Amino acid sequence: MKWKKSLTGLSSYKPGKREEEVMAELGLTKITKLSSNENPLGTSPKVAELQANSSVETEIYPDGWASSLRTVVADFYQLEEEELIFTAGVDELIELLTRVLLDTTKNTVMATPTFVQYRQNALIEGAEVREIPLLVDGAHDLDGMLNAIDDNTTIVWVCNPNNPTGNYIDLADIQAFLDKVPSDVLVVLDEAYIEYVTPQPEKHEKLIRTYKNLIITRTFSKIYGLASARVGYGIADKAIIEQLNIVRPPFNTTSIGQKLAIEAIKDQAFIEACRTSNANGIKQYEAFAKRFEQVKLYPANGNFVLIDLGIEAGTIFSYLEKNGYITRSGAALGFPTAVRITIGKEEENSAVIALLEKLL
């Protein structure tokens, strides 16, 4: 086959191990998955009720415009419906962005380490990837990213909070950054974990009307607990949305996914409960880190913590796995002596911390 040359050297995305796989390998009867940043509290009771009582006409194509969901989300953020695009998770939106803006003559700027799909999709399009190392505390080097922009730059990626470090850039710094980015360079502000930030930042969706080169990406996969429903969305100027819709598949979000997302966003009481539970979980890990001088905990603002124990990452990962907890080794994330752990329920956090204390 005459494959694209840009695929040479690339490999497919490797998701975390499945619970069943680990249990079979290690002979365990119970496993807790804390590797994919899923919501340990599940999803809204209203979503569960809809799932139990909903019937889907599987022979009928879904609404390609996601009309009902579009109206609800637009009302929620006080936006115009044409300022939104819905995709099969943010993953698909990232793919669409690289497809419309990158080719072999262009380059893109991002932090490293950050969410791996920015780089992967850029390389598939044959673009040059300019990676700017994070600062020592895990924060974006925004000045370094600005300096990397040139006439051939078309996209700058900012993951906020950043995955895998958890660092959060406040709104004032984001605006100062946007003020300096050329108006013909798209800034992707990936806010997959924004609902977990405590306290919640000031509403800033309407920044897209000041910065016509900004797209904000969000998802129903994280705090809303709809990871398997695959519903993400982008907020941007209408001109950006129009270009993305040219390459967006016509029926890319499912009927049931759209319905579940509507119920999920309506139940903000559940979201607040998830945010509070998550903040308490972060405090558990912060207290643990304070007890051990050799432990470095990166600033946590998502639903995960990145912990450097000064021990080889594979050793930490295997140790926790053998004791019934799947985490994410930092080795593949650019942190050879760290692990990324999804914040779980209080008792799950306590159990993991107790295991880490024994390891130290």
Curated annotation (Swiss-Prot):
Its cofactor is pyridoxal 5'-phosphate. GO terms for biological process: L-histidine biosynthetic process. It is an enzyme of class 2 (transferase). The keyword Transferase applies. GO terms for molecular function: histidinol-phosphate transaminase activity; pyridoxal phosphate binding. Its EC number is 2.6.1.9. Gene3D superfamilies: Aspartate Aminotransferase, domain 1, Type I PLP-dependent aspartate aminotransferase-like (Major domain). SUPFAM superfamilies: PLP-dependent transferases (SSF53383). Keywords: Amino-acid biosynthesis, Aminotransferase, Histidine biosynthesis, Pyridoxal phosphate, Transferase. The modification N6-(pyridoxal phosphate)lysine is found at residue 222. It catalyses: L-histidinol phosphate + 2-oxoglutarate = 3-(imidazol-4-yl)-2-oxopropyl phosphate + L-glutamate. The keyword Amino-acid biosynthesis applies. Pathway: Amino-acid biosynthesis; L-histidine biosynthesis; L-histidine from 5-phospho-alpha-D-ribose 1-diphosphate: step 7/9. HAMAP family: HisC_aminotrans_2. Belongs to the class-II pyridoxal-phosphate-dependent aminotransferase family. Histidinol-phosphate aminotransferase subfamily. NCBIfam families: hisC. Homodimer. This is Histidinol-phosphate aminotransferase. It comes from Listeria monocytogenes serotype 4b (strain F2365). The lineage of its organism: Bacteria, Bacillati, Bacillota, Bacilli, Bacillales. The gene is hisC.
